[in-house]
Structure formats: C-alpha cells, structure tokens
C-alpha cells in the first residue's frame, strides 16, 4: 500500500528554468566574491568540482564534508577563508534568486491534501545545497519546511542524486519500503530511475528534463494539474470513525453543541485504539493511564441532528512519554469540513499517577505507537 510520496523540487513543486537558475546563481555569487577581491571563475570551478564530488559520494561522509574537502583542496588562495563568505551569500543574498521563480498554488494544495490524508512526504531534491538554501527554495515554491517529513540537504545526505544509495538512504530515514512509495519529478534520468528500486513513479511534463532522449512513454505522466488529480484520487490513510448526530447533542440553535465535538474526538480515539488491537481497557489492565494534557477544536461549519459525520484521526507525535492526535470531522455525504482539532496526552502509572516511559516499562505498547508513526 502506498503511504509515502517523494517529490523533486525544482521544476516539479517549484516553477523554475534550471539553466536560468544556474546562470543567475553564479552571476550573483560571482559578483559577491569579486567584490572581496577573489577571482569568480576560480571559485565557480571549485564549486563545480565540489558538486561533482558530492554526486559521486560513496556514503563514507556527508555531502557537506565531501564538498568542503574538495573545495579546500582545489588550490584556491585562502580557500578556507571563503567559507564564511559563502555562508554569508546563502544567508543574505541567495534569496534574491526567487525573482526568476514563481510559487504554484497547486503545489500548496497537493501537499496540504496529502498531509491531511496521512501520507509521509519527502522532499527528494538533489542534496548539493546547505539546508538554509534548500529552505529558501522551498519558500519560493510557496511551501514550508514543516510540510515535509524529510528534506534532503548536503548536511544530512551521504550520496548524490540519483544514485541508488541516495534513494535507499531516503527510504531508511522515512521508514518506508520501495513498494510503499511514489517518486514524483520532472527529470527522466534522476527521478524515474526509482522505478528500478520498486517504487511507483509519476513524471511531471512541465519543465521536463530528458538529457538522453530516453523513451518515457511507459511512465504515468502529465501536467501539474494532472498530478493534482492523480494524488487527490489516492485513498485517505487515516482511521475513520462514523458517527450519526443525536438529537440530545443539539443546542437551542438546532446544531450540535460545541463541547460535544470533544466527546466525538474521544470516541474516535477509543475506537482507534480498539482497531489497533490494544484498547484502553487493555492499557488500563496493564496499569497505564493516558490523561489529556491539552485539547483544541476549531469549528468550520455546523452539524445538524441526523447528519452522519466521519471523524478521521491521525497520530502526529509520539515520544514514548507523550502523544498527540489530530482530528478532522467532515460530512459523510458531502465531504464538507465541519471541525478540526487535536489532543495531547501523557502516560502515567495508574497506581501512582507518576509519568512513565513506555519504551522502558511497556515496550509492546511503545512499539504499537511507533508503528503508527512509521505509517
């Protein structure tokens, strides 16, 4: 079952002409280093050499370590003194390159929909930039780093894209198997190669890159609009609890009283635990309690008597001592959003009320929740 979606960034989620980006990037960087008395051509050559080394990295070091090793050994005068200057460029001037890009509302919509439905999302962008630069490129696409469960950068990657090692490392970090993933990108060579690992793929044909004129007719493909429709058709992975609104739950306005939504959250959470095979009754018999620390609810549209709603639930955080659950209430017939919310809980020893770490005291319950986080 598919539970993980990997996206390329440039030319996929972000509108970008790759050649124009490289030209603009080196033009701005060259101007900065020239203003400090350095030869831009020499520095650009050293950057290309370091980038090439990252693409061939064998996993023995991070791409960051690989890049600077080659850069420092490039023969540049005062090569080590250039690092603060390059750091300054990424922190202060790199963002001006956004002028050649534009955000895409569809990207925001797709990511939001996938997160809402419980999918793990990885940004499998070429890990040759530092995190600060990658996060800026994410912002250019109208997205945020928090939209992704993993973002590959030169700090956290040990291989270059599209090596098999790169993708296997991505899968390992996300805790996903190849057959559970879809890789989405606009590069026939660097993105579609994941099919050989057992992943499903989708080729975005806007800003298509096909350096070797490879026949790509066999791949699922289309525009970003086509992709949005393709992803929208993916099933909702969240646990779903069906509930008919009762007459006694309404208020004098004829709609469900606001406090009852909190009760529905609890009903859904209890049903979810039963579904996992370790209900609240079993947990209490094991001597564990799970009191509520916080609960929040936002109301979007009213529910009336006899309406049937679905309360969809997802585990969003688990530390071994605490967990956080998100909820979404929608009309079963129309899909209209009624309410959203979340609750946070801790774990305590019922006999004493003292906090406990499930990893130490109840590893079976701990692993149960860990498994849900890996989904």
Per-region residue spans from a language model:
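Active-site neighborhood of HAD-like aspartate-dependent phosphohydrolases
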Residues: 1-46
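Asp-based, Mg2+/Mn2+-dependent phosphohydrolase catalytic module
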Residues: 1-5, 112, 126-128, 135-238
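Hydrophobic "anchor" residues
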Residues: 12-13, 256, 337, 355
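A metal-dependent, Asp-based hydrolase signature
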Residues: 41-91
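Short, acidic loop-to-helix structural element flanking the phosphoryl-transfer center
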Residues: 61-65, 80-84, 88-123
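Hot-dog-fold acyl-thioester-processing enzymes
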Residues: 236-294, 350-375
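HotDog/MaoC-like acyl-thioester-processing domains
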Residues: 237-241, 299, 303-305, 316-375
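Hydrophobic beta-strand-centered segment that forms part of the acyl-chain substrate-binding groove
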Residues: 272-323
């Amino acid at each position: 079952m598919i539970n993980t979606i990997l996206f390329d960034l440039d030319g996929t989620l972000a509108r970008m002409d790759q050649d124009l980006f490289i030209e603009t990037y080196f033009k701005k960087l060259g101007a900065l280093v020239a203003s400090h008395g350095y030869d831009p051509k020499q520095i650009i050559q050293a950057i290309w050499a370091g980038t090439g080394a990252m693409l061939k990295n064998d996993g023995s070091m991070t791409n960051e370590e690989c890049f600077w090793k080659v850069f420092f050994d490039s023969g540049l005068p005062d090569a080590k003194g250039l690092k603060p200057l390059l750091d300054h460029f990424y922190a202060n001037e790199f963002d001006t390159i956004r002028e050649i890009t534009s955000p895409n509302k569809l990207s925001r919509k797709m990511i939001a929909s996938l997160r809402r439905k419980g999918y793990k999302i990885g940004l499998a962008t070429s890990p040759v930039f530092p995190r600060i630069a990658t996060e800026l490129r994410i912002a250019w696409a109208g997205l945020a780093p928090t939209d992704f469960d993993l973002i590959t950068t030169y700090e956290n990657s040990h291989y270059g894209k599209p090596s098999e090692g790169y993708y296997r490392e991505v899968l390992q970090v996300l805790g996903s198997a190849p057959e559970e993933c879809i890789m989405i990108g606009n590069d026939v060579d660097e993105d579609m190669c994941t099919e050989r690992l057992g992943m499903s793929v989708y080729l975005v044909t806007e800003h298509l890159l096909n350096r070797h004129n490879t026949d790509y007719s066999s791949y699922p493909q289309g525009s970003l609009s086509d992709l949005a429709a393709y992803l929208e058709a993916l099933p909702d992975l969240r646990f779903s609890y069906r509930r008919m609104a009762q007459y006694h739950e309404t208020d004098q306005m004829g709609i469900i009283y606001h406090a009852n939504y909190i009760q529905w959250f609890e009903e859904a959470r209890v049903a979810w635990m039963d579904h996992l095979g370790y209900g609240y009754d079993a947990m209490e018999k094991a001597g564990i309690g799970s009191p509520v620390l916080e609960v929040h609810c936002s109301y979007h549209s009213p529910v009336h008597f006899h309406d049937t709603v679905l309360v969809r639930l997802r585990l969003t955080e688990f530390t071994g001592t605490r967990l956080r659950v998100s909820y979404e209430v929608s009309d079963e017939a129309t899909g209209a959003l009624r309410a959203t919310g979340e609750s946070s809980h801790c774990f305590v020893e019922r006999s004493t009320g003292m906090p406990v770490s499930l990893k130490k005291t109840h590893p079976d319950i701990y692993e149960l929740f860990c498994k849900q986080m890996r989904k």
